[in-house]
Amino acid sequence: MQGTEETEANRRNRISELPDCILLHIMSFLEARDVVRTCILSKRWKDLCKRLTTLAYIPSWDENSFKNIQSWVLSSRDQSCSLRNLTIDTRFLEGEEDLHTLVQYALFHNLQHLNIKINPSLTPKPELLPLILTSHSLTFHELSYRRGKAAVKSPILLKSLHLPALRTLHLEYVNFVATHDHYVDPFSNLRALNTLVLMFCALIEDALVLCISNQTLSSLTIFGVPSADEFLLSTPNLSSFTILGCPIFQQLLSSTCNLSFLQQVNIDGFSEGIGTASVFLSWLQVLANVKISKIGYSVIRALDYVSHSSILSLLLLIKTIIWILKYVRRCQCSL
């Protein structure tokens, strides 16, 4: 028994003897409350958590837990250390001021990755979004407002984004308003953007056309955005395009460029509705340069509900054969 206890003690000592960089890396996978608790383990751990550059807050039953974490960050964390990654899941009903203060602190400490999930019962301070949009350090931002079908009531309205270092943007349940002539064009000023994901977003007021205008964008995913009458692409470097859960037999797709770098298109999740096959045919024409196209069964099945379905099915079959032949030729040339 004594030998077992000594073995356990040695194991604990071995962990404590690891370099700070390794311990900090291990701690980056812990939830914020557990990170703070490590300070009571020993003198070796007392101040280690204060230099952690990654914090993730997951809600608990304790209503004061978020306030406590926010207070610890402001009062005890090493102010000379950058805070690179911050994840906040706000399932609590209150704490607008605490949320704003913590995000502000992080942005002033060279924050690069920001992931925020906001509870429907929580209304963030109006200053929160403009605060985020002034960041020159953010490279990744995910914002989920969790408004569900009530997204139209969301106070978060984005006209234009100005984050010079941002490479990945994920927006969920966010509203857009028109910038000019019924057009929504919020992404054209993101000079480093590579990946864009839009989920359950809405165009409100007089906005009708969603413009995805960006010179550097490579990957685009649109999921459940039925309020747009048209999607307009101005993305010369786009290589991957996924659209799911949209009424593509009713929504137009156009492009200002030939999308010559487009490698793969995924279309699925279509819900039946009134529309014409000619609309979807125009999609195929816009996406004519794609190398690989994956069209889900829901789209094929929907062809039975629209006019000229037999013609469209034939065109789709012919186009698929052409794609396959082109791919085989490229493979043969590479051998």
Regions inferred by a protein language model and the residue ranges of each:
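Hydrophobic lipid-interacting interfaces of membrane-associated proteins
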Residues: G148, F176, C201-L203, C246-I248, ...
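Extracellular beta-strand scaffolds
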Residues: H113, V177, M199, L203-I204, ...
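C-terminal, well-structured subdomains that either form a transmembrane helix-short loop-helix hairpin
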Residues: I322-L335
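LRR N-terminal entry segment and analogous cap-like coil->beta motifs
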Residues: D78-R91, Q112-N119, L138-H141, Q263-D268, ...
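A structural signal for leucine-rich repeat
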Residues: V103-Y105, L128-H136, S154-A165, H182-A192, ...
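Short, polybasic Lys/Arg-rich linear motifs in disordered N-terminal/cytosolic regions
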Residues: M1-Q2, L284
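Leucine-rich repeat
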Residues: Q2-N214
